[in-house]
Amino acid sequence: MTDAETDVSGVPEIDLTDAEVLRDPAAAYGRARELSPLARVSAPGMPAMWVLTRHEGARAMLNDPRFELGAGSYMRPAGIPEHCLAYMRTMQEMEGPEHARIRRLVSPAFTPRRAAEFRPRIEAIVETLLDELEGHARDGTADLLAHFARPLPMEVICELTGVAAADRPRWREYGAAVAAGRGQEFADAIPAIMEAAVAAVARSRSEPGDDLISDLLGVQAGQEDRPADAELVTLVWHLVLAGQTPTNLIANAVDTLLRHPAQLAALRADPGLMPRAVDELTRWDGPVLLTIPRRAREDVELHGALIRAGDLVTAALASANRDPRAIGDPDRLDLGRAPAAGHLGYGHGPHFCLGAALARAQTEVALAGLLRRFPGLALAASAPGHLPDPGTWRLASLPVTL
């Protein structure tokens, strides 16, 4: 079936390869939402999944222990060396007490207060990248994705994990490989990423500094339970993977602002709106369309349908974040919207994004720097296009005139 048609049971069926779904997923998932709180999504080569389309149902599922994340929730490239596999099992693959323990140990390094303390260092990175962006411009046009939004998160990760300046070019290459997706380039980069992460943890242990890993080693030093080096290496790996989310959030936010001149003008006139603006941009045009699928641990009845044990279940954030039952006038971009709107852009429940405060800080600093440096910033004539990815809303490029 195509975009939001229903099967004989009345549950909407969404073909993730349908051109309309790929062109405008918010609209496609939104049509399914208005038909039913529960739908099915499918694509050739992947198992069908149940999808919660409305805000209330999505929020409930993300907090329901009957649906769990695990290794099967992720697709990994083939040929990864055995010694790397132990480092690849991040918190996202853990549940229950195991997940709670790791989350408790690492959370002190990811508080809003710590993100605020790191903010001046993020600002310095942004200013350097903006200087370089001008150098990449040809006839006044530059690709903001390639030369700003993509390198920024990896530069921040290097800064926050204490990676030496001399080693950062290699880490930029790692970030580019991760951004490329699940291809051979990604698989080939994994051993080098793990080796670099092991070295970063060892350096922070022997020479503590003002960085995230040293924070974790110091905070836990006096406690019986503390993160092992292998767990810290896994955290660095997780940061490298998660860095792609701020990339897409920043690029989407710039694209959206440049297409809404009245909202852009309001933000320029009142920079104090920036925290609310970033929350609204995350809700309205966030990069996560579908959450990482969870597996039902037992038979569960949802909205009149039987979810069998082992079935995959996801939440359509693209439709939940525009659900009129939860958010007033949800299809309107309003940078002054009150944060109480309660979007799910960073997830919900035990797996709420650990780095949400850091992602917000990066995005706020990036947008503020761009708007300040380039008052005439505009989309170039060659309009950007989105990649055909039904799970992640991400641009192929972002050509702008400076």
Which ranges hold each PLM region?
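Cytochrome P450
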Residues: M1-L402
